[in-house]
Amino acid sequence: MAASKETMQFQTEINQLLQLMIHSLYSNKEIFLRELISNASDACDKLRFEALADPALLTGDSELKVEVDFDPEAGTITVRDNGIGMNRDEVIANIGTIAKSGTREFFERLSGDQTKDAKLIGQFGVGFYSAFIVADRVSLNTRRAGMEAEHGVRWESDGTGTYTLETLDLPARGTEIVLHLREEERQDLLSAWRLRSIINKYSDHIPLSIRMRKIGEGGKPGDEWETVNKASALWQRSKSEISDDEYKEFYRYVSHDYGDPLTWSHNHVEGRLEYTSLLFIPAKAPFDLWDHNHPHGIKLYVQRVFIMDDAEQLLPRYLRFVRGVIDSSDLPLNVSREILQGNRVIDQMRSGSVKRILGLLEEMAEKEPEKYQTFWNEFGRVLKEGPGEDYSNREQIARLLRFASTHTDTDTQNVSLADYLARMAEGQDKIYYITADSFLAAKNSPQLELLRKKGIEVLLLSDRVDEWLTSHLPEFEGKALTSVAKGALDLGAIETEEERKSQEETEKDAEGLVERIKNALGERVETVRVSHRLTSSPACIVLGERDMALYMQQLLKQAGHEISSTKPVLEINPTHPMLARIEGEKDDTRFAEWSALLLDQAILAEGGQLEDPAGFVARINQLMLALAG
């Protein structure tokens, strides 16, 4: 095939990323080798898996390996593998663009502080681009397994905005990356001892042979190769043999994270079912956590043979932040994603892994509450999806939930349902909560007025997932979760007989006003009634017990969902001066304006959106003019 060479532009974000890495990650520059070896190992894993269906892919070179070489005279370090390789389109997709979500958010969060930015960059995942931390030019030669030699591809760039692509003959499959080191890096990195120490530090656990040339006469690399890592599956070793540092390095390998994990669980299960799991909980949420199109899951091995990344069937979506591996002895080597669906072995491993993770979190919450709070701040909103997805573990998940509450009146979500139960008032038989589109909207909601006056704690829920959560978590330890903004407020034994009688008298006295407002508002409301939850506000909106909060209805409508309209109930406080003013209004037209204004204000306070904002403003202006003059 005739060679064809063209110059192409990097995706804009890569340009920025390259410059940031060179400056922010320089203090930990040796991670470039970890990242390149990790990618090479993944390429070999993928070839091993594809070869299960097509053994011819391994023809002529069945021993999968990674080689690290260096040339002091040329000033280069080479990392090569005989894995799956890439074709031209894959090179453009994997090297010329960033396929991850959250790119824009990533750049918005950069602060200019090198230490903080280094952590963010690592959290985003640097991968191949880390080569430019130490190199001023990088060449990549690759050919995909199963393609002819003439379909080789050469990619080359100096990291300044463009790269070249060239077609060439490559006799061997796999990928070779050549780093042309910056002048100032050569003395430090171009030695066998230095490179081996980096490999032993970061990549000892990779279950694949990493080879370097044996050192010959004069300290120069010879012609023979030797394995320089342990090349054993870390998860198969006994826990007592593995140091915390080894666990942390393995986490970085399996997650492509830059920092340490928050905690981990390593288990060997024996009996009717045999498998090993090594599961990590990250300390920081990845940028693609909320990207539903991005695959999430853990690595699946069968008898130490890599089968697939992102095996979503092994953990439910509400635990998608977990990283790690599961190695089974009870699955066939030719297992596919289709076979994983409804597989008994998979179901049992999934169930065991879920219980292990939830147990790990419970132990952390009990023994290390500050550490658990760190976890909650990063992943709490994801865990809130659990009761709706995993009915069998709903109670255990509920014990792990944390909320803001009127007990502290801060937006910190650190109140558990058990904490709430321990503080319940005498005679209280419900767990009260309110949902809103922001913490301040929840905290300042008029629906809380009576409960605050009585000293009854209310959970303040302002995450978008909270409406979903409460619809799937009706009770906790026998106490019903009850919204103070939906249905009639029943305080049960908390209310005295005198209070009930006073309410009945207020209702009777306000019958005429209620009927008049109801007639004025017509079809805009389900009904109008006297409120027993207001003490200082003139009115509030109350929804049906099964209705969705107004702000959630609005969000779903904006997203294009068909939402059936529900009419709110308007509750009024007849003792409020504004209601006294309305009641004394003799002009029916002006009374209707006051009533509409009362409803509009209540809708806004509830987080709803007015159908006619201009009409609302006009009514305010008219009433202000009337009062002024």
UniProtKB/Swiss-Prot annotation:
Q: Which GO terms describe its cellular component?
A: cytoplasm
Keyword check for Manganese: no
InterPro entries, per the entry = HATPase_C_sf, Heat_shock_protein_90_CS, HSP90_C, Hsp90_fam, Hsp90_N, Ribosomal_Su5_D2-typ_SF
Q: Where is this region: B?
A: 338-554
A GO molecular function assigned to this protein is:
ATP-dependent protein folding chaperone
Question: Where is it predominantly found?
Answer: cytoplasm
Q: Per the record, which residues fall in region A?
A: 1-337
Q: What UniProt keywords apply to this chain's record, in alphabetical order?
A: ATP-binding, Chaperone, Cytoplasm, Nucleotide-binding, Stress response
What are the boundaries of the signal sequence? none
- The source's superkingdom equals Bacteria
User: For the region C, what residue ranges are annotated?
Assistant: 555-629
The record's listing under SUPFAM superfamilies reads: ATPase domain of HSP90 chaperone/DNA topoisomerase II/histidine kinase, HSP90 C-terminal domain, Ribosomal protein S5 domain 2-like
Q: According to its UniProt record, where is this protein located?
A: Cytoplasm
How does it associate, per the subunit comment?
Answer: Homodimer.
The family database entries (HAMAP family) matched by this protein are listed as: HSP90
- Its job: Molecular chaperone. Has ATPase activity.
The family line of this record is: Belongs to the heat shock protein 90 family.
Could you identify this protein by its name? Chaperone protein HtpG
Gene for this chain? htpG
